[in-house]
UniProtKB/Swiss-Prot annotation:
GO terms for cellular component: cell cortex; cell leading edge; cell trailing edge; macropinocytic cup; macropinosome; plasma membrane; pseudopodium. SMART domains: PH. Residues 950-1162 form the Rap-GAP domain. This is PH and Rap-GAP domain-containing protein DDB_G0271806. Residues 95-160, 335-361, 376-400, 645-734 are annotated as: Disordered. InterPro entries: PH-like_dom_sf, PH_domain, Rap/Ran-GAP_sf, Rap/Ran_GAP_dom, Rap1_Ran_GAP. One of its GO terms (molecular function) is phosphatidylinositol-3,4,5-trisphosphate binding. Pfam families: PH, Rap_GAP. Residues 35-140, 165-257 form the PH domain. It comes from Dictyostelium discoideum. Residues 98-155, 340-351, 687-732 have a biased composition (Low complexity).
Amino acid sequence: MHTGEYSELLIGINGHMKKITLKLKNNLEEDQYSNCVKYGWIEKRCGKNQSFSSWKRMWFILKDSKLTYYIKEKNLKKRSSTIGSTQEFFKQQHGIDNNNCTNSNSNNNNNNSDLIHLSAPSLSSSTSSTISPISSSSSLTTTTTTTTTTTNANTNNGLSDSINHVYLEGELGKKKEGKGWKVRWMKLLEHSLVYYKSSKDKEPLGIVNLNECQDCEVNKESSNKFVVVHSSNRYYFKTNTKQELTQWVKSVKSRIPSINQTKMDLDQFQLKGVIEFNSIQQIAETFKFNSQPNCLTITTDEKAYYLSFDSNKDKLDWLNQLNLTINKFKGGFNSGGGSNNSSPSSLQSQQAKESGNGGSLSPNILGNFKSSIKPWRFSSSPSQGRVSIGGGGDRSSTQVKFVDNPLSKSSNKEEFDGGEYGSQILPRKSTIIGPNGGVKVSTSGAVELSPVLISSNNNNNNTISSSGNSIPTCLSDLINESSDNEDGDDLKMMIPESLKNEMMRRSAISSLKNFKLEIFIWSNHQEVFTFLFSDSVLVDQVKAFAFKKIPSLANLSVLDYRLGIDEDTLLEVEFLKFIYSHTMVELALKTCGIVKIGIFHHRKDRRVKEKLYSDKFYGHLLSQSPDGRKGNGVGIGGNGIPIEYSRSEPNLQSCLSSSPSTRETMVPSSPSSHQLITPPPSLKQYEQQLSSSSSSSSQQLQLQLQQQEQEQLLQEQPEAEQSQPEPQPQLEPESEIEIEELEQPIEELLNISTTPISIRSNSILSSSTSASSSPSSTPSLTPVIERQQKMSAAGWHSVNPSVTLNQRRQLISGCPGWNIEVSNPTSTFTSQGFKPKFDKQEHGFYRRYNFDGTSTVQSFLGVDMKMGPLAFSLAKDANDNYRGVLHTKHGAKTISEDSKNIVGILNLLSLSKKVKTKKVVSHLIGLLDPSIDAKLLNLASNQSELQKELLSFEERQTTSGFKFGMVYCRHGQVTDDEIFSNKQGSPEWDEFLSLIGDKIELVGWPHYSAGLDVKFNSTGTHSLYTDYHGNEVMFHVSTMLPFSTTDYQQIERKRQVGNDICVVIFNDGTLSYMPNTITSQFNHVIILVQYDKQNNGYKVSMACKDGVKSPFEPLSPNNLIKKSDIKDFILTKLINGELASLQAPVFASKITRTRESLLNYYISQFL
């Protein structure tokens, strides 16, 4: 059985045994408060090893021989704040029966003098006459009043009618932690604090159970705020005056049991732990936790307990009581040679002198206890240990001899130095490969792990050692860790020594397990390497060894690559053991003992580019290893990482012998998208295979290839062209030509199915073959061969099959998540008579009819169940027409209606002005949206302020400033790093910029800046700007943004362009562009522009992300766009593209939430 299985077994056994022991101990004690000296709420630091710990509030009971602490039962359901549960809570807390409620006017009149109403108006005017101060908490609990109100026959249905104990009520500001301030009507009851929306409401919004509260205190001395600390939250309240604040704090405090030290009902608690007095070695004051200034440390034989108190007074009270109780239990305590009758204060001063740090006094040391009574131990061999006195790293320490418990971790005896968790971040230490396969993790406080456990004959206690050094074993550490429960209690379960020894022996044998790992590198010439690793190896060790031993990875950066099951599932957490790094890895190792892992770049966009442009990124992987190693080999098993490895390469003979159905090919799924699988071997491999064969067979094979190419070409040409010889164009040596897509006859001859690809080759056939060809092969030289020779003369080079070569004539190549706009073959674009149409809402309602005109605007607010918050404004213009605008979370709608038509339809002549306005509003809203009920709208208050808010709200939705990206791409650039590294563009690029806008200087620029720095030139000195039909447009030009000589990724340039919704790519080459080249969540529209030198015009194509409604005006034409027309086309396309993108789900949801929150704010303020 594996070591991990033993540890899980031990953890389960210890956990169950501990729970059973504590429950038995709790049940056997019929009265938990018997022999009780002191009890109260104390915060205890909990967590394994107390390194990643939290503070939990527990109920402590100090008895004459031990200190026990309890915690609330976890299976108790928390009370909800709903109305149903609120009623049940009132029935439980106050014994109320709704069916037996009685209404007594006499009780209300007689007891009205004892009821305290803290309403804001009454307090400000006559506070002294309405407030009757409460002298003490006892008077509040004993002098309760019965107050009921006269209600109708439906009294039994109202919850507020069931409240018969109200001690304090008034209007307060209320705020939950993490929420905003709200005005609520508060009522203080016997055991709860109830809050309503207003004083007239009968159903409460929620209840704060004071029995579950821990404290009530003034938040800040200079403010009128106080906080009620609940077990699950914090409630902040705000009063109008200091007198109200004092009254509320005093009254609430008197009803919190934890403050008044009322005995808690332990039926709702479970025993969490016990601290026996005979195991306590010292009690000290500690100041290592910044957030807990009043702390004590109780150090026992096995661990240290950290307790935090609410105040220094509580801490001193508990210290004195602990000292007296332990002194009484042990008949006097040791204080380092002091007298047993020393008081705590004298003992404190005496030990402060002995334990001063650098001559300074340490008044925190209060006692050091030692008893001859020791609990039962597993081992009889003594050991030395050091116990920290004072609980801090700067305290002096004294050695105390005690018998060690093998089930307790040594790290528990000394608390980590460095203060409270979260105050500092411990740096990750390097992992060192140890001898015999051992992995020593050099982390502070960690135990050295050894996957190969060797039994030592020199140790009688069957401990485990590695390389002669006695260190704790993996299993024993896991056993020790299993003994530390959530709060690290000192109750350890008893495991027989024989069972422990047997587990140690078996784990030493089973720890020699290993697993087989296949590492593949994605490329056209895919290689797979097989290694045998120990099961204790980490993910980063596997990756580092792969980069060290695989020759093709020698020149790559280890930090830029990750191991992964596939390109979408990477092993990002590299400090884990490899066998536990992912669920699929664990499953594969459990089922077959082998797993296949690839090496991928950590950036997703780079992985996509490596797939599509494998010839560029993986060209260096085609080289063979320096030592020519093939097949299986022996790794570096001596240092414990891999044991053996093997390497497999593609074999031509296996490709020839396999059937077409078994070979993986590249199959296109659609004209714009391709499903990429393992490609076939390249032509270079076939050339090497052909050259190694006999000369006669090589000549025969080449003749067959030439004949088959000629036949294929003749089949594709029309019959008219077959009768006439094809004209041969005159080519310049340095010119580039585009060739038609040709089939690869060599693949057909080898019975391998591929897609048509474009080939550029310096030498299609090997030189040795062409030189030794027979004379009979000379007349069979076809136009295909001649065309290949011309390509070689023109400088075309051989590349691996690539998807982009199939789409050379397309400006934009397809990729997942993007849609390419299909150009209209019959449409043309010209700027003559062109009037741009923008798909944006041009309202200007409030600016036109209220602030810039003389019309009277009335605004109405309301909430619809389906549409949410609504705002409708009505105005009557100079032409006696009614105009209205309806704002919802989905946008704004406007309407205009002639008043004569409305009067005739609604018969408004005999109606009053108020009724007439309601009918007009109802009529207009029915025309805008019939599903909205106009009766839900009410006339808002403070119309002038609301009109200003609605004007601002309208201007937010009306976009007048646009920012777009403008990027220059040279010929052959395929990655974003290359594109953003262009310091300057070509003359065609500069001409294109001058056609689109004006080059402006940023310093002191007074108009729309699009986030560019106009004061200090931190984002460049110049930019491109234009004002197009009232729309200010600023471009983020890639060559004008700051260039960094040290940052090869040009993060500043990517940040500016990556935040633009629409981007223009000026492609100064012939390669097609992929829309996902620049990785950004904001880029939704890509417009590619390519200059045609021969026709002196621009080719334009557009692609947009999924979710963007397309097409939008103007449509991309099939022909060229003239230079004089390019500005109108590009700017109109960009503006409409951004407006369409804002309707995409990723933007629309955010805009909808913003509108809804603003409308809700207007309703809360003006309705």
